[in-house]
């Protein structure tokens, strides 16, 4: 039974050596913004649709984008690194100890405004000052008179990633520019930039381009950047693979550019969480491939990762220490003195740590296929827990991708699923699960929403399945249904689809907003923004008349229902029955009760819910059919089932 799983947190102090931490993989991310500073990037784009909005330049919008992303990461991903590199500036700065370069490696016209590191409150405030303070921006955002070498920019980024994030699994370089051909007249510099881009790719850094088109010129990536940007391999699930889209500034102000950049970056900034890596998927004896598992869908909730002490001048993280103390003597108990016992027959039976481990050991982590069943045999109510998405990994066994793809396509073609024995990691409780094939899902822009792969859906235990209570619903009449259909049609969401990205969790966002204000030493917000509140004015405008018509129809149908009910009471008194008639009436009631009890027992027998009947009803039924009514409830149920089986 799923509810009977023991609490592993209570045993954590005695199983520290045995817990397999490699089963959960957290991918830290390092993002470096490379924003070009040029005359065109500093020119504010006019907004003909809004006269009140202040025009903003693409460079300012990109800096705002970096600022907002830094705000988000300081709360949601506190271990990720973010940096801002300005190139094409008149002044140069690489590190604080050397304004013009680092040792013998000069990077002219490259200004490292924010070093690649975990963002602190001072970094966020400094970047915000650059965006809002015009004097500060006029001091730094000065375009150089001579062109900057893209090879130097990429080599500078290479040095930053190598120095600050050498072991990060995800490293990305965001280039924001409106120049689609920076070295149109110099093939040597273009070739050097291509070589530096290849070096970044070999280092594991993914270059992402945010091209900005102008009203007079569309950004053409084929002139220069197609040779620099390497797309990720489709067989690598942890390598980002995004389509490059152009962001036009024509007819839009800096806020529109910012929103466009933020939506594109937010789709890339979701951290990858691997529940397990290189887990064997056993298709048969001595036939295994390796897969990795990801939890794609999960409800987010505020989680405490540590305790913070706010009593001093600065907040400090509390280091917790667990100490076990004996109740009788209050002395500290050593780890080797601890024994765990279970109560059997009124006595406590103690087990050693080795015996405890042997009891919980169900074998090595594995996904073992037991058999195959048609998808029609998997009911929708069998989904009781979060499903795990699995994808092939070549790290464990070479050729896993080909075998995995063949299995997935075959299951899709034959409309079947695999029944598997699933042990996620060491010391984990095994479960019977359904291995369901999944197709790739794309949105209207042909962007991938759900990747192709397979899903592990844990199946419920027998004790998890409950019998639904009997409900007698009143079906609404057709006129009332027709009126409600009109209301639903006018209130339908765009394209009839719910987009969770448009409705963030208000309580979670409020929690993050408070933490952000505390971390950045800002004023606490007065009110939370809740996008889940219905738009009552818009609802009334669209469906107000239809709702009133539905209410009138509801009253009409209610009157018809009340008028159709039979009269169940009268004012006339009945004469007192004679003793003979009273005896006959009692006999009639007894016969009716027995017949009603038989019908009820038969109904529960057909539904398989005899255990819902009381012992009294079961005994009366058995005695009325000359059967024994002694024994426990289970024995009575068995006799009732045997009685109906013989019929």
Curated annotation (Swiss-Prot):
Subcellular localization, as worded in the UniProt entry: Nucleus; Chromosome, Telomere
What ranges does the record list as Basic and acidic residues composition bias?
1-10, 579-598
Its job: Single-stranded DNA-dependent ATP-dependent helicase. Involved in non-homologous end joining (NHEJ) DNA double strand break repair. DNA-binding is sequence-independent but has a high affinity to nicks in double-stranded DNA and to the ends of duplex DNA. Binds to naturally occurring chromosomal ends, and therefore provides chromosomal end protection. Required also for telomere recombination to repair telomeric ends in the absence of telomerase. KU70, of the KU70/KU80 heterodimer, binds to the stem loop of TLC1, the RNA component of telomerase. Involved in telomere maintenance.
One GO-annotated biological process of the protein? DNA recombination
Chain segments carrying region Disordered? 1-24, 569-598
Q: What range(s) does the SAP domain occupy? A: 610-644
UniProt catalytic activity: ATP + H2O = ADP + phosphate + H(+)
Family as reported in the entry's similarity comment: Belongs to the ku70 family.
Q: Does the keyword DNA damage apply?
A: yes
Please name the CDD domains in this protein's record.
Answer: KU70, vWA_ku
Stored Gene3D superfamilies: 1.10.1600.10, 2.40.290.10, Ku70, bridge and pillars, SAP domain, von Willebrand factor, type A domain
Q: What is this protein called?
A: ATP-dependent DNA helicase II subunit 1
Q: What class of enzyme is it?
A: hydrolase
GO molecular function terms attached to this record:
ATP binding; ATP hydrolysis activity; damaged DNA binding; DNA helicase activity; double-stranded DNA binding; telomeric DNA binding
One GO CC term of this entry? Answer: chromosome, telomeric region
Q: What is its EC number?
A: 3.6.4.12
Per UniProt, residues of the Ku domain are 282-472
């Amino acid at each position: 039974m799923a509810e009977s799983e023991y609490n592993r947190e209570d045993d954590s102090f005695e199983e520290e050596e045995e817990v397999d931490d490699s089963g959960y993989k957290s991918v830290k991310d390092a993002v470096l913004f490379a924003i070009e500073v040029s005359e065109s990037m500093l020119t504010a784009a006019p907004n003909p649709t809004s006269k009140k909005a202040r025009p903003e330049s693409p460079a300012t919008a990109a800096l705002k984008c970096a600022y907002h992303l830094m705000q988000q990461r300081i709360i949601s991903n506190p271990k990720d690194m973010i940096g801002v590199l300005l190139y094409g500036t008149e002044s140069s700065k690489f590190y604080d100890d050397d304004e013009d370069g680092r040792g013998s490696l000069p990077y002219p016209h490259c200004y490292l405004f924010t070093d690649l590191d975990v963002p602190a409150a001072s970094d966020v405030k400094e970047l915000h000052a650059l965006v809002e303070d015009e004097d500060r921006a006029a001091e730094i955002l000065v375009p150089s008179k001579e062109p900057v070498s893209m090879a130097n920019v990429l080599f500078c980024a290479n040095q930053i990633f190598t120095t600050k994030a050498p072991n990060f699994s995800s490293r990305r370089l965001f280039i924001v520019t409106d120049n689609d051909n920076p070295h149109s007249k110099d093939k040597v510099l273009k070739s050097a930039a291509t070589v530096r881009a290849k070096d970044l790719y070999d280092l594991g850094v993914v270059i992402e381009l945010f091209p900005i088109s102008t009203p007079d010129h569309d950004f053409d990536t084929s002139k220069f950047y197609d040779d620099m940007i390497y797309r990720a391999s489709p067989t690598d699930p942890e390598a980002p693979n995004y389509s490059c889209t152009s962001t036009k500034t024509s007819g839009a102000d800096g806020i529109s550019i910012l929103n466009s950049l933020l939506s594109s970056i937010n789709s890339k900034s979701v951290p990858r969480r691997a529940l397990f890596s290189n887990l064997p998927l056993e298709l048969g004896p001595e036939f295994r491939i390796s897969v990795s598992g990801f939890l794609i869908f999960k409800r987010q909730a505020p989680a405490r990762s540590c305790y913070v002490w706010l009593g001093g001048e600065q907040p400090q993280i509390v280091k917790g220490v667990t100490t076990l103390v004996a109740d009788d003597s209050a002395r500290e108990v050593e780890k080797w003195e601890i024994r765990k016992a279970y109560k059997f027959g009124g006595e406590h039976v103690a087990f050693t740590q080795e015996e405890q481990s042997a009891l919980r050991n169900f074998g090595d982590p594995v996904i073992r296929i037991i058999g195959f069943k048609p998808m029609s045999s998997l009911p929708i109510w069998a989904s009781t827990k979060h499903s795990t998405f699995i994808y092939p990994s070549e790290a464990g066994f070479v050729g896993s991708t080909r075998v995995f793809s063949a299995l997935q396509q075959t299951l899709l073609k034959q409309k079947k699923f695999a029944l598997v024995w699933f042990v996620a990691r060491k010391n984990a409780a095994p479960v019977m699960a359904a291995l369901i094939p999944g197709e790739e899902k794309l949105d209207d822009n042909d962007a991938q929403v759900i990747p192709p792969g397979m899903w592990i859906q844990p199946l419920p235990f027998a004790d998890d399945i409950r019998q639904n209570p009997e409900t007698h619903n009143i079906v609404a009449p057709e006129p009332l249904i027709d009126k409600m259909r009109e209301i639903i049609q006018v209130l339908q969401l765009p394209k009839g689809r719910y987009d969770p990205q448009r409705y963030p969790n208000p309580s979670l966002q409020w929690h993050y907003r408070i933490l952000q204000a505390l971390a950045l030493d800002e004023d606490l917000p007065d009110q939370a923004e809740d996008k889940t509140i219905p738009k009552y004015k818009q609802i009334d405008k669209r469906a107000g008349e239809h709702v009133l018509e539905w209410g009138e129809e509801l009253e009409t149908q209610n009157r018809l229902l009340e008028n159709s009910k039979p009269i169940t009471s009268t004012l006339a008194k009945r004469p007192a029955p004679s003793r003979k008639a009273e005896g006959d009436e009692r006999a009639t009631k007894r016969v009716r009760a027995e017949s009603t009890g038989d019908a009820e027992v038969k109904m529960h027998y057909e539904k398989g819910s005899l255990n819902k009947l009381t012992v009294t009803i079961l005994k009366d039924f058995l005695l009325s059919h000359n059967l024994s009514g002694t024994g426990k409830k289970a024995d009575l149920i068995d006799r009732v089932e045997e009685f109906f089986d013989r019929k």
